[in-house]
Amino acid sequence: MSLIKRIPSKNDTDSNDRLIPFINGEYRCANNDSMINLIEKLIIKKNSFSFDTETSSLSPFEADLVGISISTEKETGWYIPINHSSGNNISESNLTKIKQLFENEEIKKFAHNANYDISVLVNNDFKINNLNFDTLIAANLLNKRSLSLKNLCLEILRLQMTSIEELIGKGKDQISFKDVDIEKAVNYACADADATFRLKEIFEDELSKIGLQDVMNKIEIPLIPVIVEMQKSGVSINSQILNKISLELKNEISDLELRAKNIIGNEEVNLRSSQQLSDILINQMNI
């Protein structure tokens, strides 16, 4: 889900470094057989693509998947409408082709905040194989000032992206992304996938230079599907052992409270009261 842009402050730029609107490259809507076949050929040829999802909610397992944007190279993007309330959405047969591309183990995939996007896709019967890079995680490893895709574009690419509010509004007048016209969604959604592709190339090089590429490849990326599954299915617990631990901790806390009250010399004191503790420690015990 795309995040709202940050308004540039004086510290973000200066008079000699002018921000420009995000370049609308070759951004297209892919909602027919010929377009989907073209995407399929391009992805197989490039053997990699960046992707982003457009949804109806920030909660991935409650969100409707409205569309997917894909980029196979800089300044390109394809928006695949899936569940807009009006307009021509992709057919089920073509959606199956897109799912097969995500499932293909030979094709590398890149995303920004893959945890969210993969959670949404998995909840819509996608299977994601060979996730290769996450620009949000890379930004964190590189100690970037912001982790937001739009802020990173502002900071690194000097490109200002469209705010989600420009499409869906805000407050009581806010609409769902499902109700955004497909034509208006294309440039917005494709810019996210395009930006992810551009940042991936930059961050991958930076991680390699400081020796953190293995951290991304061997630790961070393999953890994402594990975390997604945990968020979706939960984690099994042994309730008997947890109840036993809970009882042990409760008894230990009671013993500590009794010892503290004996030291204070007042069995009626409420140790959970910050006011009483403050009076005892500062005024009575001069600590």
Indicate residue ranges for each PLM-predicted region:
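Nucleic-acid-processing active sites and adjacent nucleic-acid-binding tracks
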Residues: 33, 73-109
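A structural signal for short coil/turn segments at secondary-structure junctions
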Residues: 43-46, 102-105, 125
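Metal-dependent phosphoesterase core characteristic of DEDDh/y 3'-5' exonuclease domains
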Residues: 71, 115-172, 202, 226
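Conserved "right-hand" nucleotidyltransferase catalytic core of DNA-directed polymerases
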Residues: 1-85, 144, 152, 164, ...
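Acidic beta-strand-to-loop metal/phosphate-binding motif
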Residues: 50, 106-114
